[in-house]
Amino acid sequence: MELLVKINKKLEQRRAILNTIIQNVGIQNRILKSAQILAECLKLGGKIITAGNGGSASQSEHFSSEMMGRLKNSRTPFPSLSLSSNASLLTCIGNDFGFERIFSRQIEGIGTTKDVFIAFTTSCKSRNIIEALNVCKNSNIKSIPVGGINLS
């Protein structure tokens, strides 16, 4: 029974988050703006670049996989790649330039002004994510941070 209580508590927490989003026009507008940025990127022939650390790396890879795969409907694949996927490249850059540069260095190499960078993060404090967002800003590459935000 104790496990069921824990499960219900987690479900209630998720419901509270969804209710906050439903009731907050500001959050809804940020979601809409993100969708518009992604649509414009694809319309212009850009690609969606994603990255994250730990579990967020898995989210990054999953998102990019769904963009290249089917998601819900058969369609032309949307150009997308996860910067978290290549262990050889991550360790090469980490060794040569420092772990904080593992994503920004890749963006410098492949990013264009048509692209969008999605940073999956729970804390919004990881140095490598911050560095990547700074490179995007300085290179006029649009970016969307996902997660780790205060919903109020």
Language-model segments: which ranges?
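Residue-level recognition of alpha-helical structural elements
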Residues: L3, G26-R30, S56, K137
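A short, well-structured juxtamembrane/interface segment
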Residues: Q23-L44
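Hydrophobic beta-strand scaffold residues
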Residues: I48-I49, S143
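Glycine-rich phosphate-binding loops that contact phosphosugars or nucleotide phosphates
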Residues: S56, E61-S152
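Generic N-terminal amphipathic, Lys/Arg-enriched alpha-helix
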Residues: M1-G26
